[in-house]
């Protein structure tokens, strides 16, 4: 059975932040602590990117309003011995979703790894 690299997107809310950089730092720290506490230190955490509608540049996927931020997070992991890409997504969502309860997870990318 093939191995896959699965990337999921999550929407994470952070309170009491001053700016975008603060929101990013707090998000990575909080999610990292939750994942590491459950032994999921193999999950990679990145901040998503979006295209600025005005200038067309890539910017961090973070919105801060009234010291509350909505942060787009990318979580990726390798899934071994999955039957199909869809099966790999289900495994990744179940593994990460056990720790990040009540946080929506959507697949962004699935790549079959070469042996």
From Swiss-Prot:
InterPro entries: UPF0212
Pfam families: DUF555 (PF04475)
Superkingdom, taxonomy of origin: Archaea
NCBIfam families in UniProt: PRK03922.1
PANTHER family: UPF0212 PROTEIN MJ0068, UPF0212 PROTEIN TK1194
Family per record: Belongs to the UPF0212 family.
HAMAP family according to UniProt: UPF0212 (MF_01223)
Name of the featured protein: UPF0212 protein MJ0068
The species this protein was found in: Methanocaldococcus jannaschii (strain ATCC 43067 / DSM 2661 / JAL-1 / JCM 10045 / NBRC 100440)
The organism's taxonomic lineage, starting at the top: Archaea, Methanobacteriati, Methanobacteriota, Methanomada group, Methanococci
């Amino acid at each position: 059975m093939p191995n896959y690299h699965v990337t999921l997107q999550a929407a994470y809310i952070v309170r009491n932040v001053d700016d975008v950089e603060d929101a990013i730092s707090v998000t990575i720290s909080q999610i990292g602590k939750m994942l590491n506490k459950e032994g999921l230190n193999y999950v990679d955490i990145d901040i998503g990117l979006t295209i600025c509608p005005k200038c067309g540049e890539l910017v961090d996927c973070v919105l801060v309003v009234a010291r509350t931020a909505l942060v787009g997070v990318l979580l990726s992991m390798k899934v071994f011995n999955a039957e199909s890409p869809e099966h790999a997504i289900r495994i990744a969502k179940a593994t990460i979703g056990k720790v990040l309860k009540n946080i929506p997870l959507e697949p962004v990318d699935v790549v079959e790894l070469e042996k």
